[in-house]
A protein has these predicted regions:
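NAD(P)-binding Rossmann-fold cofactor-contacting core
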Residues: 25-40, 169-189
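Glycine-rich adenosine-cofactor-binding loop
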Residues: 6-15, 21, 146-166
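Rossmann-fold NAD(P)-binding glycine/threonine-rich loop
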Residues: 98-113, 236-279
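Phosphate-coordination loops involved in phosphoryl transfer and adenosine-cofactor binding
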Residues: 2-4, 91, 146-149, 229
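Glycine/serine-rich phosphate-binding loop and adjoining beta1-alpha1 elements at the start
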Residues: 59-147, 257, 276
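Rossmann-like adenosine-cofactor binding region
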Residues: 62-66, 79-91, 186-261
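Short acidic-hydrophobic, aromatic-tinged amphipathic segments that line or gate anion-handling sites
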Residues: 43-50, 193-197
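Residues in the short beta-alpha loop(s) of Rossmann-like NAD(P)-binding domains
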Residues: 11, 34, 100, 178-179, ...
């Protein structure tokens, strides 16, 4: 049974997570947040040696940006991952988001779980991602979403939520996908369903194009057909789904909008992480 939790590094998402876990009865400490960590809900630890003395160690998302230092933007000093891995108890459960191979190697011998790979988190994160994408579209286009033609490329978690929200705002929603089963669902929900091979035939009349597929879909052939007044918003993780250099050469407006949950809705994102970690703790016993 896990009782003590230490949240080390991160941003407002992790502070939200710490507060919520405390409210559920866990004894929570935080480290690596500076003055932003003051709260009656948890203990703001100043000594990293004491901070790591917990049943559960929760690291940020991503754990690191360079495979050497912990991602701790609020902390005045560098927290070396090697130092951290050396002082955490071997019997602690270590949780982190978007854990790289280098981090897994450092924590060899530990029970370490990537909470950002959990399906429930990815599904719920689709909502702040979709809302953030629409917010960007509203700020980058001179027209309303209502009555706009919007193409959503890909009908996975984000594509499903995004299409529904756009439809609710009155957009004329086109959905492209590779699988015919996805196209069938898109048709059932009242969208204009097109196969990825047919994107080039409808791309010119789109006002906003949202890509959710992390593979090259919007290549040179398709980009040449896009209206110069359109906006392309790429929500896919690296390498993205747009030929960015060709789009730049053509003078197209492309926004690669990564990590929207943490930027647009950090408190909601923190709540989603908390719910996911609570599920993990129940499973791990």
């Amino acid at each position: 049974m896990y009782k003590t939790v230490s949240v080390i590094g991160g941003d407002l998402r992790q502070l939200t997570l710490a507060k919520m876990l405390s409210q559920e009865g866990y004894l929570v400490s935080v480290y690596g947040f500076g003055k932003d960590s003051l709260s009656e809900n948890y203990n703001a630890e100043k000594d990293i040696q004491k901070a790591v003395c917990a049943d559960v160690i929760i690291l940020p998302v991503p754990v690191t940006l360079d495979s050497k230092k912990l991602n701790a933007p609020f902390h005045e000093e560098t927290i070396a991952l090697k130092e951290l891995s050396d002082i955490i108890k071997k019997d602690s459960l270590v949780l982190g988001g978007r854990i790289s191979k280098e981090v897994y190697d450092l924590f060899e011998g530990y029970k370490i779980i990537d909470y950002y790979k959990r399906e429930e988190l990815m599904i719920k994160n689709a909502v702040p991602t979709a809302e953030g994408a629409i917010e960007i579209a509203m700020g980058e286009t001179p027209v309303t979403i209502s009555d706009s033609r919007c193409l959503v490329v890909g009908y996975g978690r984000i594509g499903k939520v995004l299409s529904r929200l756009l439809q609710g705002l009155g957009a004329d929603v086109y959905v492209s996908a590779r699988k015919y089963s996805d196209l069938a669902w898109a048709d059932v929900w009242g969208y204009r369903a097109i196969h990825n091979d047919e994107i080039k035939d409808c791309i010119q009349k789109q006002d906003v194009i949202f890509n959710t597929v992390p593979a090259l879909i919007l290549d040179e052939d398709i980009l040449k057909r896009i209206n110069p007044d359109s906006v392309i918003i790429d929500l896919a993780s690296k390498p993205g789904g747009v030929d960015f250099q060709k789009a730049k050469d053509l003078g197209l407006k492309v926004i690669w909008a990564l990590s929207l949950p943490g930027k647009c809705a950090p408190i909601t994102s923190g709540k989603i992480i908390k719910e996911t970690i609570t599920n993990i703790l129940k499973e791990e016993g």
